[in-house]
């Protein structure tokens, strides 16, 4: 079966610390929008490092979705998909090869699995989070990440996945519904978003 060119444009892999600057930028953009996370103030890369280390220590996964740049396309005028490098005089050196087979551009979205609850008995259940950079929305990247995470979660002993979503966030609720998530809970007005009460919907999915 021939690979869809659109599918070949992106790569999802486990994030590393070098990815945290891009991950932090995307998360902070979501914080300012006030509709996807209950974090009220922008976070620093150092704070995200502690978050990342906690995920690594508990074998919870953080994934980065980045574009893959075709070497033949990277130098074309108007091509914005590839991360470009410049010399000290500002000369465009083109997209620089990082991997052996592909050139990799910037991170456009990221997702994670986190502990649903710190007590040991809840280890079979994880919370999923997915964020896309503002300029990358509307491209189906969240869908790609959710699909990837669902396929890989059982390898790490995860049997149930839940999402914590503001009840007013119809786009996110619809995204998870497409993957068979059903409403497992509703917490009315449990969040204060700087004076605006938000209810929380909890979609869940059993992976067995």
Label every model-predicted segment.
Residues 137, 163-173:
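Conserved beta-strand-loop-alpha-helix junction that forms the acyl-donor binding cleft
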Residues 112, 120, 162-165, 182-199:
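Conserved catalytic-core motifs of GNAT/GCN5-like acyltransferases
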Residues 11-23:
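A short beta-loop-alpha structural element at the N-terminal edge
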Residues 25-42, 54-58:
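Helix-loop element at the rim of GNAT/NAT acetyltransferase active sites that forms part
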Residues 153-165:
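Conserved GNAT acetyl-CoA-binding A-motif
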Residues 27, 176, 181:
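Conserved active-site tyrosine of GNAT-family acetyltransferases
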Residues 41-135, 146, 206-207:
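Acetyl-CoA-dependent GNAT
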Residues 138-151, 174-178:
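Conserved acetyl-CoA-binding loop-helix of GNAT-fold acetyltransferases
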